[in-house]
Structure formats: C-alpha cells, structure tokens
C-alpha cells in the first residue's frame, strides 16, 4: 500500500482549471464553497483548503473543469533531465503498481515542445521506478484511469500535480443526448451567473437545443449538486481517501435538494428531435416533467410570462450553418425581442460581431467569453 505522508497536511494548495475569461467568477464560486487565499490566474484559480473542501468543490462546483493538487516542481531542461527528476520522486506515496495511470501534459520549452513526447518521459520514469522496486508496473489507461497526473512545462521546470477530478466536471454525466454544437455545461452555468439569473427568476431559452441552459438552471433551482452525476472521481483512488467524509458530504447534499422549481423554466426549439433530446437529458438529472419544452420556430415565440430572463445561443457561422444565411435570422431575433418581449431582459451569446450587429438593438452590457478557443460575447438587452 502507498503511504499517505504526502497527503498529511491539514490544508494544502490546489489549482482549479477553468475556461479562459471565467477565472474571476470561478474564484467567487470557490470562495463561496469555502476556499481560502483564492487567487485567479491564467485559465485557473489557485487556492488552499482541506480535504473536505477538495471533495466539496468536486461535488458542487458548476464552473470549473478540474481540481489539481500540486505535488512537486522539478527540473526539466530536456528529456533526460525530466526523466531523472521524475524518477527521484517516491511514487509509492501516491499510488501502487496495481493502479492504472494517465499522464496529461501542458506547456512546453525549446527541448520539450511536444506534449505527447513529454508525457511519455514522465510515464517512463514512473513505471521504470516501479519495475526496479517491484518487478511490476502501473498500466496506462486513457479511458478510466485510477490516477491522473498533470505535468506542466514552464521554462526549465515541470510542475507535477495529481488530478483529483478525472472526468472533467463540464461532462456532468447527465447528457447522453446532444444537439448540434452544444455548450459545455460549465460555460452555460457561467453565462447564467454573468446574466445575473437566480433561481427565483423565470427563464426562457427559445433556441434551447439539447437544453443546457435550462438543465443547469434547473439543477441550481433544485439545489442539486452537479457532481452527483459523475461516474467517480480520482480522489477516491488516492491512499488518503476518506470514505466516511465523502459519504457524509453526499448525504448532506441529498438532504438539501428541493422538489419544486422556484420559478418556471421554458425551452423551445424548431427541431422536434432536439426537443426530445432535451427531455431525455432532463430525465437523466431529476428534472423530468419540471421544465416546459415546446417545438416552436423562433418566428412564432411569445413571452411565456409578463417578465423574466431570456437567454439563447444562436448559431454563429463558425461551426454550424453559414454566416451569410444567418444574417436575416439575427435581424429576426432583434425584431421579435423588440416587438414581443417588453419587460424582459434578454441575453444573446454569439461569436460573430457582424451577425450580432444585425440584431439592431442597443446593448446595455457586453461580457467577453472564450468558447473552445473562439472569442465570444454575451450581449445584454433591456427590453422596455
């Protein structure tokens, strides 16, 4: 059995990875979950906390991808340097040869400029140490590894971290049925936060696709921990895993769930199959029968209440559909909002400035957001 001395500190530093542009609101969420010394950095947030906090963040965070536990920074001038440095670490403290392994590598320097090659050096150093000691070694598993190690190359050093999460938290596990170019769940939650939506406000997505905005809103409204849908977390394979603590956090989360939404949620889309997918996704996450779904073309939508928040993610020509064909549709979005949704606040998320100009309404706020490498903007319209 690995010894647990590497995990013995009461509180320790962690790093949560997050989409670029979402660092500040992720830092706010982590603070609300109990993190201390919270510091937004590039594409992530550094913080400190105890084991209970680590578990709680994996269970409850709606915005981050994963939580890394930094374990060592070693010399990495070139491949030989990195191999020697990695092999000096006592890997017995972290896992045993019976456990499966995956190495994820980011960053580069002039000598280590290919992430797959760098990951191979890290893996070779670890399994060679195991073979020298035990005549057996951890197998690599790229699908469902027990242990995931993150190696980040910066200048002539490599920062090594244990990944506590495993499957990225944006893959909630509730969404087997996808529409075209779906939003990541973490991004949908972040956009709802930016929009100032809270569970007591009615919400309508007239271009709902597979339902991501509404599913994330529903989970918030019912106080359901998004992490409960994950198949498992890597920290459960760590030598210091506290089963009783984890069970207690799960029980507390379950006890705090609500049965009814605090305000109505509506979703419509012109594609019947997509609406069926959204209903199926809702069923997977305790939201079956709680959200109003309707097959409806955008031109035919009407406000389902006197006031509320409307949010949508129309196609913007980069991935689905061609830009030229979308200009008229964006103009229609503006016309429908202006003529029918007085008293509402609308948000349109798009990655195409030329198209959003066709909406023809004055924005009251703009929030820049990165979506899978595409610079996008969340546009706010106060409809009077």
Curated annotation (Swiss-Prot):
Coiled coil: none annotated. Its EC number is 2.1.1.-. GO terms for molecular function: RNA binding; tRNA (guanine) methyltransferase activity. Residues 53-164 form the THUMP domain. Gene3D superfamilies: 3.30.2130.30, Vaccinia Virus protein VP39. InterPro entries: DNA_methylase_N6_adenine_CS, RlmKL-like_Mtase, RlmKL-like_Mtase_CS, RlmL_1st, SAM-dependent_MTases_sf, THUMP_dom. Keywords: Methyltransferase, Transferase. It comes from the Bacteria. Pfam families: RlmL_1st, THUMP, UPF0020. GO terms for biological process: tRNA methylation. Belongs to the methyltransferase superfamily. This is Putative RNA methyltransferase slr0064.
